[in-house]
């Protein structure tokens, strides 16, 4: 069985994520960490009658949290709020993630690190560069969790099909739409690229197709607006993060993944088919991209590039737009580590 640590367990994503992973049959020990309230949350969850143990640790006990952890999820950070610029958000969360990943490199160097904190496009490069400097980086062990984009794509695709053609819409099952749609690229705005793999559904959507793309890309804004500035996606993010973590955990047992085309934002140069992926997106120097992954024993062993080999002209446009924006996001993360090392 597997010890899982959640860093940032008291937050809006961290609490429901902790609950969902306490329910997982693949977890034997759940360790919760935050700067406040994690001990109480751990005690609360420990009363649930599943077979995993659960302990919450205070801000001075990160070594105990991480000791022997095989999977570490990082939802820690400041959420999107009105009046907070993206740059403000980045600076705060960049420092938090750098500090936590440094601790993982020190106390759990072989752990698989799942980055949930935003902005994923910049924070995953920070995690990678931090581990590189420590001499602890393993390319298959760092994954940016972009699964919420797929969860939204599955939901919204059925919603739009119901609007356009109720008969076809009623035939669909939102829980298995990952067989007909995947999402690649990055994890913000126009870097998010929904790919409908069942092209007959593109035809069915007709003019709703562009609305579908936009809604998947900017679905998070709906939640910020609906919560009237009091928060962003937390429950749906926790669900998507738990689903992704469960696939990583299943791979420790050599079980077949439940989600077809499960994507993650990964470091391409260190992975099998990474170079091929760079060529197919038209940029041999792009270091990170979210693509379907192949997991073994909790780590990414290769990338599935097949989705890139049969793109429509419109999808190629989406990839080109995403790559331009991703380059800036990635550079921002790398520069943060470079600049902080000069201080």
From Swiss-Prot:
Q: Which reaction does it catalyse?
A: (S)-malate + NAD(+) = oxaloacetate + NADH + H(+)
Carries keyword Iron? Answer: no
EC no. given is: 1.1.1.37
Query: So which domain of life are we looking at?
Result: Eukaryota
Binding-site positions, NAD(+): 8-14, 34, 93, 116-118, 237
Active site per database record:
187 (proton acceptor)
Q: How does it assemble?
A: Homodimer.
The molecule here is called Malate dehydrogenase, peroxisomal
The organism is Saccharomyces cerevisiae (strain ATCC 204508 / S288c)
Q: Which gene encodes it?
A: MDH3
């Amino acid at each position: 069985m597997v010890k899982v640590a959640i860093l940032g367990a008291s937050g809006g994503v961290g609490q429901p994520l902790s609950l969902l992973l306490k329910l997982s049959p693949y977890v034997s020990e759940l360790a919760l960490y935050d700067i406040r309230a994690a001990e109480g949350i751990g005690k609360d969850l420990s009363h649930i009658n599943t077979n995993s143990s659960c302990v919450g640790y205070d801000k001075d006990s990160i070594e105990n949290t991480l000791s022997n952890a095989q999977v570490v999820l990082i939802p820690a950070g400041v959420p999107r709020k009105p009046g907070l610029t993206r740059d403000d958000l980045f600076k705060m969360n960049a420092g938090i993630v750098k500090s936590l990943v440094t601790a993982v490199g020190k106390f759990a160097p072989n752990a698989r690190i799942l980055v949930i904190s935003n902005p994923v496009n910049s924070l995953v490069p920070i995690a990678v560069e931090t581990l590189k400097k420590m001499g602890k980086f393993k390319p298959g062990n760092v994954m940016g969790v972009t699964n919420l984009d797929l969860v939204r794509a599955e939901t919204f695709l059925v919603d739009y099909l119901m609007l356009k053609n109720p008969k076809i819409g009623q035939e669909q099952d939102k829980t298995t739409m990952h067989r007909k749609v995947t999402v690649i690229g990055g994890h913000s705005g126009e870097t998010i690229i929904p790919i409908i793999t069942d092209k007959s559904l593109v035809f069915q959507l007709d003019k709703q197709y562009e609305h579908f793309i936009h809604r998947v890309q900017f679905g998070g804004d709906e939640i910020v607006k609906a919560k009237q500035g009091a928060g962003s996606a937390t429950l749906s993010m926790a669900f998507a993060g738990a689903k992704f973590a469960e696939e990583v955990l299943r791979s420790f047992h050599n079980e077949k993944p439940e989600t077809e085309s499960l994507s993650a934002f990964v470091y391409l140069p260190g992975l099998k088919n990474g170079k091929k992926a760079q060529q197919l997106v038209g940029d041999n120097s792009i270091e990170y991209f979210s693509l379907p992954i192949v997991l073994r024993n909790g780590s990414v062993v290769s990338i599935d590039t097949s989705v890139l080999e049969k793109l429509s002209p419109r999808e190629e446009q989406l990839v080109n737009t995403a790559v331009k924006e991703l380059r800036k996001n990635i550079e921002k993360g790398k520069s943060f580590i470079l600049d902080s090392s000069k201080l």
